[in-house]
């Protein structure tokens, strides 16, 4: 299975609709809280990487699944932020593609040379 951005947003809309009375929907003023919850999930991703390590993530199916579940939680909260601000899959895809094209032309070493005293 390969989920598209529209699929992710649709699934998250379905979850939000199911819990509308408890969670309050996705008005713009909820975006900040959803982003903060997502940062908490990023902390869980960091914990797995820090405590389990690369080798276990690559070779232990249980650890790998746990990492992926936490990454999915992060993506779900990002989808909530998009829903809160009414960002469509098409709008996001357009901006993402443009950002990628711009990044492909950037010279990150030169842009950040001052941070590394000339060492990449």
Which ranges hold each PLM region?
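Flexible "arm" and connector segments at domain edges
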Residues: 1-120
């Amino acid at each position: 299975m390969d989920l598209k951005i529209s699929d992710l947003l649709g699934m998250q809309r379905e979850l939000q609709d199911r819990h509308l009375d408890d969670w309050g929907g996705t008005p713009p003023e909820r975006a900040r809280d959803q982003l903060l919850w997502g940062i908490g999930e990023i902390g869980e991703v960091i914990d797995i990487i820090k405590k389990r390590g690369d080798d276990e993530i690559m070779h232990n199916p249980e650890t790998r699944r746990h990492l992926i579940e936490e990454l999915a939680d992060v993506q779900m909260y990002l989808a909530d932020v998009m829903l809160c601000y009414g960002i469509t899959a098409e709008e996001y895809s357009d901006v993402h593609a443009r950002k990628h094209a711009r990044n492909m032309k950037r010279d990150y070493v030169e842009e950040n040379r001052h941070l590394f005293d000339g060492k990449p």
